[in-house]
Amino acid sequence: MGCDGGTIPKRHELVKGPKKVEKVDKDAELVAQWNYCTLSQEILRRPIVACELGRLYNKDAVIEFLLDKSAEKALGKAASHIRSIKNVTELRLSDNPAWEGDKGNTKGDKHDDLQRARFICPVVGLEMNGRHRFCFLRCCGCVFSERALKEIKAEVCHTCGAAFQEEDIIVLNGTKEDVEMLKKRMEERRLRAKLEKKTKKPKTATECASKPGTTQDSAGPSKVKSGKPEEADPDPREKKSTPAPRGAATNGSASGKVGKPPCGALKRSIADSEESETYKSIFTSHSSAKRSKEESAHWVTHTSYCF
């Protein structure tokens, strides 16, 4: 039964029993929640933001998380409910004048007071170290202790004067029950926002359908009608064969819009038109452009102007 050296093992050393639950140091847990970022595990530094579940983050860490949503991140579950920068609120914190920070114990020969906090409640003066419940308002981001809101009941923020409702109050680092309640509110708020977006889309569609004339006019540039109105013609074939009036051509050129002739339009000769002789002399069909065989050059010296 004995081992080397005359030692005798006891029963609890040999028999395996159920594992004991590891006890977490409450002071260390409070320091981690109120002084370190939930996402990056770094010391909280301004600007400090809080999510809809009441967790504290560094704003830089949240932006980096949103830009790089890779599966390799170990702490992605802590911020999986944050989909955009609009889901977090920047906090307005009041500094604690009694907090010395790292300057108080530079040599390491003094006791560090873990209960001393960087921020306090601006109304009551309680330190934000986890011993007292704190909350913030979604509308403005001001942070107060829960005792201040209970003692001074008002529908207006004590610091900036912004109006708020009970749904805007979010508890910082609350219990499991508080987190479940805040999660339900968050889901209801997001569903309400989706329904509002869906109701807005049909309204815009009905407004556009009620005004068809304005949409057609705005779709393209306005067309200016030039010339005299066309007279009613019983026979459409005669209308195709007749040439276009001279006034309509001049008006079309003056308005700056040159339209293509229709497919069924007949080609007309410039020599038969009623233009002036100087205008006709430009074209090769004019009598001045025609040359006799004697005036034209032979096959060696011919140019393109001879034809």
From Swiss-Prot:
Molecular function as annotated in GO: DNA binding
Subcellular location: Chromosome
Keywords for the protein's UniProt record, in alphabetical order: Chromosome, Phosphoprotein
Residue list for modification Phosphoserine: 288
GO annotation terms (biological process): cellular response to hydroxyurea; mitotic DNA replication termination; regulation of DNA stability
Ranges annotated as biased composition (Basic and acidic residues): 227-241
Gene Ontology CC: one annotated term: replication fork
Post-translational events: Undergoes proteasomal degradation, via DDI1 and DDI2. Removal from stalled replisomes and degradation are required for genome stability.
Region annotated Disordered, chain positions: 193-296
InterPro entries the record matches: Rtf2, Rtf2_RING-finger
UniProt xrefs under Pfam families: Rtf2
Entry-linked PANTHER family: PROTEIN C20ORF43 HOMOLOG (PTHR12775), REPLICATION TERMINATION FACTOR 2 (PTHR12775:SF0)
Subunit structure: Interacts with DDI2; probably also interacts with DDI1.
Family recorded in the similarity comment: Belongs to the rtf2 family.
UniProt function note: Replication termination factor which is a component of the elongating replisome. Required for ATR pathway signaling upon DNA damage and has a positive activity during DNA replication. Might function to facilitate fork pausing at replication fork barriers like the rDNA. May be globally required to stimulate ATR signaling after the fork stalls or encounters a lesion. Interacts with nascent DNA.
Protein name: Replication termination factor 2
Source organism per UniProt: Mus musculus (Mouse)
